[in-house]
């Protein structure tokens, strides 16, 4: 049922985009015809009637914003940026700590009790628990207080947001520990801030429809935890969706948790072995 509803939602989005394109084209054609022939019609009317027709409004349009009630750029973009900020800063913290461990050689202390999968898994879970606790407190301020202070759209259920944060923080922590493969010092992760910012907003599907992206960008959407989490959070918080309506993104985050947990265990074991060999060769 969930797969059927997701497919139906994708079809609806595509049809809606086609409808918008056809509506814009037909409106443009009608306005062009009106500009061309309306002046010729006014020639045959009395002057007092012509002035009334020119000033008349044939249709009174009253617009009502469904979600972004202020229709501002900030209220549209900032909710998505909040999740990206959490992802970037958590990734940066994990990268700096992991890079410092490798640079100083202190990572070898984890080899004292062996390098079995169970031992490495306990190390990864322990680190992830600390990161998640700290960022849960950070999320209370960022996602709970900031929308109230700045009048951002906030019509979602806080329980649903909390349910979404659990796999998001886990997946981000495991992703960061797996990415420590590339960090050999504490300065390298700082470069990720400028690299990821704009791209993550694009990949999330908030600023540009995911259905219109090339297939490789759609694949990237399901690889980086921030992308599905951002899309799900905007739907939950700004559009009032339920957790079932963001089921695809929610399941994606849990799948990422499993994949990146296993990858983080392998990467950390490799980093420990590499540091141990370097220490023994001295």
Predicted feature residues:
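Oxyanion-binding "anion nests"
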Residues: 141
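Single conserved hydrophobic/aromatic residue that forms the stacking wall/gate
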Residues: 1-12
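Hydrophobic core positions of alpha-helical segments in small-molecule transporters
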Residues: 5, 79, 125-126, 189-192
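Solvent-exposed, acidic/flexible segments
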Residues: 15-19, 23, 172, 222
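Extracytoplasmic/secreted proteins, especially bacterial periplasmic and envelope-associated proteins
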Residues: 21, 25-28, 32
């Amino acid at each position: 049922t969930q797969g059927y509803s997701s497919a139906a939602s994708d079809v609806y989005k595509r049809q809606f985009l086609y409808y918008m394109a056809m509506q814009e084209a037909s409106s443009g054609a009608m306005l062009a015809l009106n500009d061309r022939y309306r002046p010729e019609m006014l020639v045959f009317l009395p002057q007092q009637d012509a002035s009334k027709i020119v000033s008349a409004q044939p249709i009174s349009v009253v617009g009502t914003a469904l979600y972004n009630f202020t229709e501002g750029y900030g209220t549209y973009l900032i909710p998505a940026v909040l999740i990206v900020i959490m992802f970037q800063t958590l990734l940066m913290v994990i990268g700096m700590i992991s890079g410092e461990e490798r640079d100083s050689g202190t990572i070898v202390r984890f080899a004292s009790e062996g390098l079995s999968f169970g031992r490495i898994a306990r190390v990864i879970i322990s680190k992830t628990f600390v990161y998640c606790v700290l960022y849960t407190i950070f999320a209370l301020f960022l996602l709970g207080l900031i929308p109230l202070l700045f009048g951002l759209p906030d019509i979602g259920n806080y329980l649903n947001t909390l349910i979404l944060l659990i796999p998001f923080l886990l997946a981000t922590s495991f992703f960061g520990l797996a990415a420590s493969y590339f960090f050999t010092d504490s300065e390298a992760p700082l470069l990720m801030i400028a690299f990821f910012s704009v791209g993550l907003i694009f990949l999330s599907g908030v600023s540009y429809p995911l259905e219109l992206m090339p297939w490789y960008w759609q694949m990237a959407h399901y690889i980086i935890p921030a992308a599905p989490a951002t899309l799900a959070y905007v739907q939950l918080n700004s559009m009032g969706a339920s957790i079932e309506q963001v089921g695809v993104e929610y399941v994606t985050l849990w799948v990422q948790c499993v994949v990146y947990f296993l990858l983080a265990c392998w990467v950390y074991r490799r980093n420990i072995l590499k540091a141990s060999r370097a220490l023994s060769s001295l």
